[in-house]
Amino acid sequence: MSTSALPAFLPRASVIQYPVCVDRANIVIIGGGVVGCAVARTVSRRWSDVFLVEQMPKFGMGASTRNSGVIHSGIYYPPGSLKARLCVAGNRMLYEFCATHNILHRKCGKLVVGHDEKQQAELEHLAANGRANGVVGMRMVDRAAVRAREPYIDAAFALEVPSTGIISAEDLIKTLARMATEQGASLLTRARVVRLDPRADSVAVTLIEGDNEDGAQRSEETIEARCVINCAGLYADEIAAMLGNHQHRIYPVRGEYCELVRAKSYLINNLVYPLPHADGLSLGVHLTRTLWDTVLVGPTADYVAEKNDYERNRLPVEEFVRRAKSLLPEIEAADLQLAYSGIRAKLVPPGHAGIADFVIERDANVPHAIQLIGIESPGLTSSLAIADHVVSLAAEILS
């Protein structure tokens, strides 16, 4: 494996060359997104012989960096759910972590806006839900207060949520990966898991180098792990299925973004959201001023057939104008250019409504495996809290 294909931020000492030449490990983490890197950093503080394997050339190339980069507050999720608990805890942990480790972020707050009495009642319900989850500092503000903060936004009132912010997910992943390696963890990219074989006191993890798309023969390497942690994101259901766990299926939902042209970036100062979709599919097309002073419009939310279908049949800019016009009346098609898209790991199938909770649990039939499935938003915000939760499950296995 060429080291030129590895992330620049990975210390050379952390690179594992094929063959792996390791027979056994305490922990193998599958998936090197923000959650996988957070788990690697946390578990390697407690245990030695920790391995993180990622099939892509760099860490965080999937959903972890193809999003709005928002630090969520926890107002949307059902009280008592893992999403609510881990988001609220993760919000506090993430701000502290960013301050300590000089990770680029901004605690800017956000406005969730409304236009009529019905929407005002929905905003008040959203605030009550947030308070039940432990979110503090929220308040309802009137049109004048909205205009003072966002002069070009049309809203009769809004829920102000000061604990929301934005973060450089790339910086966060870089720091987590570096800390994991400094603590002795071994990180491997371009390593695809092709087989998981449960044994009496371990799971055998079989890897091949690369994506195998060229059809070339690849040698297999196997690590016998006392604990396997599935952090494979969009592919977590496929990893679980290798252990005979078919309980959950991931339905990919693509979210597309546009960006305001630079000349119109003055139209938005911070974060402005509509009320979330009633079906729970998304938070709606919102406006995000990034850390680089660009303004994102999106994401949309549409089910797609393939987990890597980022670009086929992209929506035209006119569709973004239609969806954003109720927030920003001045927006026109000429103000927008297509940006990137991301794919979310939804557990709710097409045609159904509701918010599915994170699945974070020991596998019911394979006692040495921990499954993390359906880790979509607020996964970035929750990542450090998720890692702490996973440590407690790993301790049950490794004690």
Task: Pin down the residues of each PLM region.
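C-terminal catalytic lobe of FAD-dependent flavoproteins
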Residues: 282, 309-399
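Dinucleotide-binding Rossmann-like beta1-alpha1 core, especially the glycine-rich loop
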Residues: 69-145, 149, 155, 284-285
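Helical element adjacent to the flavin cofactor pocket in flavoenzyme catalytic cores
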Residues: 159-226, 384, 393
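Flavin-dependent oxidoreductases
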Residues: 38, 196-298, 302-311, 322, ...
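N-terminal Rossmann-like FAD-binding beta1-loop-alpha1 element of flavoenzymes
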Residues: 25-52
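Glycine-rich FAD pyrophosphate-binding loop
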Residues: 44-66
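Short beta-strand to alpha-helix junction loop
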Residues: 78-89, 113-122, 160-179, 188, ...
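Extreme N-terminal leader/targeting segments of oxidoreductases
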Residues: 2-27, 45-46
